[in-house]
Amino acid sequence: MKEKLTVSDSKKLFHEQFPYVIPGLYKRIVDEMLVELNLLNHQNEFIQDDLFCVGLTETFKELTKGYKPEEHLRVLFESLCNSSNFEPKKIKEASKKTLEVYKDKSLKEISILLKQKSDSNLYSSRILNLGIYLIIANATDFKDIKDPEKNKIISDIINKLNLSFNKAEKDIGIYKSSILKMEQAKELLQEAKIKDKKEKKK
């Protein structure tokens, strides 16, 4: 049985394993993921499904794009997992294997495969919902389909998996918004750096 750690315990463990300063742009993302993993560690019904593993690895990858130094990312991910009793190696392996299963497939093929997991007794979480969404979004024909039809397909799959579409829709919306805000913040930082260089040359 996993040890139930408080958020303070998890933060202490995290900083012991990751003794580096986290750039301000990424600090909120890291804090939110740490708290979320800690809370999931407390849920007795929680099951670490392969779709959850995809959600964790892929959202981490997307939300930490542009992180410097890049070589810290591996330790950062491992520290986040270890600090709440999750096993980073197993999570990465499960994610890689699962992504291979759904690779180069159409939306229809992915939909059939995902719906086969309807008896898996999935534990609803933001990370799981995003794992499902990111697999669907990787479909070869996803970009060719209009938004209303995309939403209907996502809704059908989520409902078939006995999960809440309203919650999934909210999680997906917040995730997309976070990605957009990160991109905008990075652009502003880049512009500020260019401006600063020009000022110094004067």
Swiss-Prot record:
Keywords: Coiled coil. Residues 174-202 form a coiled coil. It holds the Pfam family ThylakoidFormat. One of its GO terms (biological process) is photosystem II assembly. May be involved in photosynthetic membrane biogenesis. This is Protein Thf1. InterPro entries: Thf1. NCBIfam families: PS_II_psb29. One of its GO terms (cellular component) is plasma membrane-derived thylakoid photosystem II. It comes from the Bacteria. Belongs to the THF1 family.
